[in-house]
Amino acid sequence: GATPHEGRKLAILSSRGLESGYWALAGYPILWSSNYSAVTSTFEELAQHGTWSFGLMHELGHVFNLGNSSWNWNDEMFANFRMQYGLEQNQGKVWMDERVYTGREILDMYKKDYDNTVYTQVNDNGIHYMLGRLAGPGGIGWEPFKAAFRELTTTGGAPSGKYDKFEYLLSLLSKHATRLTGRDVDVKTQYFTEADLASIRKQLQ
């Protein structure tokens, strides 16, 4: 529920001053590289498909990384997780992999990585999928995530290891889901398989 930059309107400025390889950089304002065709091709995509820009939405996700961030083991992943929330709440559209994803459909993109990597060493997109599916039908919904992130960003308390941070997040999700639903929720045992957890441990060790 926090608002970045004291609620001021966020500008997106095209710039030739970005280092080579950067598509855009989060901040106030967001800087968008005009060294290549990113700006032109993005506006062509918006006109053709009625989409928002995946890349700019990703940078907006970084902008909403507020407060204590000691719990956050990978903000590239969590920037996309915040983007998923924004797309779902507004039925926003993005163009990726030669198709349009609307709202929660974006999770289908991350499921591909989950399916391809979970039985070896799941990648960050696969972890995003496992967390993202929790917020959908049959899961715990978004409210426990909001409460957990609010607690993490205001009070801290997360351990130092990446996998330990992951488990700590699950424990907070369990606590808040139990409080909000009135039923006993253990996210780790009820929504993750042993294969899921072993694969995540390999990635985050």
Regions found by a protein language model. Name each.
Residues G1-S14, S70-N72, V94-E98, E143-E151, ...:
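Surface-exposed patches in mature extracellular/periplasmic domains of secreted proteins
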Residues G1-M57:
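Juxtacatalytic substrate-recognition/specificity segment
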Residues R104-L197:
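Active-site-proximal alpha-helical
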Residues W23, W32, W52, W71-W73, ...:
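A residue-identity detector for tryptophan
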Residues D196-Q205:
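Non-catalytic terminal regions of proteins
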Residues S41-R104:
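Zinc-dependent metallopeptidase catalytic helix centered on the HExxH motif
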Residues G1-L10, E59-H62, L87-Q91, G138-F145, ...:
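Loop/turn elements at helix/coil->beta-strand transitions in domains of secreted/extracellular proteins
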Residues Y22-T42, Q91-Y101, N116-Q121, L173, ...:
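Short, Lys/Arg-enriched charge-dense amphipathic segments
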